């Protein structure tokens, strides 16, 4: 197993080519890498590629590619209810890195959950336009608090989400994390005070699903091309 952590989009392909050249057969990456993964799947038909947290038309999926996707709307529904229940202003915010079909599913679930708890709740939503711009995210949240009175914030924004936590700490408002236990992460970080404003995190347990997929590979039950 080799892990790569390249964050520059123009370096994604080089990173994957490196591991292919080193003899790795299975390549696993998130939906951020979809275009590169599909390109390499055609160029390296003997390799197999697993794209995590993505969905697309089955007709467009090569035979050596598998997708793992989730019902993120369901977890977001629950934290939407939590956000509405904790809000004192009656305004909650959901801020994302970029608008994609998967992210839209997060947002829809959050909105549905908040409105199920309180039909009169107001919801503001914005996209930073990047997964790696915490400064812009922080400014966005501060503006939403000032202009819209938002007082509970949910982030689905990758590394940009750090700016939401910083804003909530400054504002004294609640934040909700995603994908990992961000309370635990910040509690052990150089900024443990950020943990104090995190209500909870919406987890999809991506790691568990990848392990489960490879158990199917080992048993000859994995499905490719879908």
Describe the residue ranges of each PLM region:
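A residue-level marker of the well-folded mature domains of exported/periplasmic proteins
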Residues: 1-226
């Amino acid at each position: 197993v080799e892990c790569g952590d390249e964050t520059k989009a123009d370096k994604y392909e080089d990173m994957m080519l490196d591991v292919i050249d080193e003899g790795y057969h299975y390549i696993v990456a998130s939906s951020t890498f979809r275009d590169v993964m599909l390109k390499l799947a055609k160029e390296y038909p003997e390799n197999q590629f697993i794209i995590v947290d993505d969905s697309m038309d089955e007709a467009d999926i090569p035979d050596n590619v598998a997708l793992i996707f989730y019902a993120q709307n369901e977890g977001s529904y629950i934290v939407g209810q939590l956000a509405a229940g904790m809000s004192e202003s009656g305004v909650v915010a959901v801020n994302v890195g970029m608008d994609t079909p998967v992210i839209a599913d997060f947002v829809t679930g959050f909105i549905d959950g908040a409105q199920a708890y309180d039909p009169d709740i107001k919801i503001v939503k914005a996209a930073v336009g990047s997964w790696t711009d915490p400064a812009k995210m922080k400014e966005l949240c501060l503006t939403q608090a000032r202009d819209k009175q938002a007082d509970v914030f949910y982030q689905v924004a990758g590394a940009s989400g750090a700016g939401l936590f910083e804003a909530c700490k400054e504002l004294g408002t609640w934040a909700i994390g995603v994908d990992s236990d961000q309370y635990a992460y910040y509690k052990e970080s150089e900024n443990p005070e950020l943990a104090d404003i995190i209500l909870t995190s919406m987890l999809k347990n991506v790691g568990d699903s990848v392990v489960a997929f490879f158990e199917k590979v080992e048993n000859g039950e994995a499905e490719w091309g879908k």
